[in-house]
Swiss-Prot record:
Pathway: Cell wall biogenesis; peptidoglycan biosynthesis. This is Phospho-N-acetylmuramoyl-pentapeptide-transferase. GO terms for biological process: cell division; cell wall organization; peptidoglycan biosynthetic process; regulation of cell shape. It comes from Streptococcus pneumoniae (strain P1031). It comes from the Bacteria. HAMAP family: MraY. InterPro entries: Glycosyl_transferase_4, PNAcMuramoyl-5peptid_Trfase, PNAcMuramoyl-5peptid_Trfase_CS.
Length: 326
């Protein structure tokens, strides 16, 4: 436990030092920052804010987790799988950000390219993961999927990777939402005695807390796709490594809600010839524009943050209660 906590403290301190250096480099190199293409007027002031800050907490967390696990003899197949997903999905996000920032391609990777790279990473992940079994936990009951587990694994990894990416649209929202989710999985890992997974979790929590100091409103830096895609993939990988896949539907209710809102909006828009359910999706923008109803007073970014963090915290506590108190 001491090793895991130490890993978290080290990544926190490294990120605390690394982010200002990253921002300074970004400014000195005169790199064009985040472009704003949203209809939320208050976001226009954020244009030019340095992005790709997720690169800092990703590198520090992966390296610290790797070396701490290695030298404490806790490096395992689980640790390797989770770090692999972090690196690979981080690379996909980095390429996407690179095209947007340096090549001025607003779309970055097109959806097919991004999906292909995410699926490739998922397949490689499965080749290692299958050693751990092909059993899917459905609300605590084992379901043997055999070869078909690969299809679930790909859906889980790609789905939650993109879901966290969609959530990253308000200052600080995604970073603390993931901290809450990881904290819940940290408890599960500790109870299961999987200290290797706990080490990776605490390392990332430390990195995210260090990043949040510069990412809360008004954000001095954004994590970019390099951070959000990696974090979503990490959550999916951890849920599988702990054989508690179903828990991510509750622990990750914020990401599920954000993604579902987009799917509902697009489907309803097509079916009705242009009508909308929400004022704007992902749904956190709906709240920004008009509160819960969409017709009330606009919510500040802090209010949106605390609402979603509260939902995420309650969902995480509910999951732990279901697992260990019922």
């Amino acid at each position: 436990m001491f090793i895991s906590i130490s890993a978290g403290i080290v990544t926190f301190l490294l990120t605390l030092v690394g982010i200002p250096a990253f921002i300074q480099f970004y400014r000195k190199a005169q790199i064009t920052g985040q472009q704003m293409h949203e209809d939320v007027k208050q976001h226009q002031a954020k244009a030019g804010t340095p992005t790709m800050g997720g690169l800092v907490f990703l590198i520090t967390s992966v390296l610290v987790a790797f070396f701490f696990a290695l030298f404490s003899s806790q490096f395992s197949n689980n640790v390797g799988m989770i770090l692999f997903i972090l690196v690979l999905y981080g690379l996909v996000g980095f390429l996407d950000d690179f095209l947007k920032v340096f090549r001025k391609i607003n779309e970055g990777l097109n959806p097919k390219q991004k999906l292909a790279l995410q699926l490739l990473g998922g397949i490689i992940f499965y080749l290692f993961y299958e050693r751990g079994g092909d059993i899917l936990s459905v609300f605590g009951y084992p379901v043997h999927l055999g070869f078909f587990y690969i299809f679930f694994a790909l859906f889980w990894l790609v789905g939650f990777s993109n879901a966290v990416n969609l959530t990253d649209g308000v200052d600080g929202l995604a970073s603390i939402s993931v901290v809450i989710s990881l904290s819940a999985y940290g408890v599960i890992a500790y109870v299961q005695g999987q200290m290797d997974i706990l080490l990776v979790i605490l390392a990332m929590i430390g990195g995210l807390l260090g990043f949040f100091i510069f990412n809360h409103k008004p954000a001095k830096v954004f994590m970019g796709d390099v951070g959000s895609l990696a974090l979503g993939g990490m959550l999916a990988a951890i849920s599988m490594a702990l054989h508690q896949e179903w828990t991510l539907l509750i622990i990750g209710i914020v990401y599920v809600f954000e993604t579902t809102s987009v799917m509902m909006q697009v489907s309803y828009f097509k079916l009705t010839g242009g009508k909308r359910i929400f004022r704007m999706t992902p749904v956190h923008h709906h709240f920004e524009l008009g509160g819960l109803s969409g017709k009330g007073n606009p919510w500040s970014e802090w209010k949106v943050d605390f609402f979603f963090w509260g939902v995420g915290l309650l969902a995480s506590l509910l999951t732990l209660a279901i697992l260990y108190l019922m």
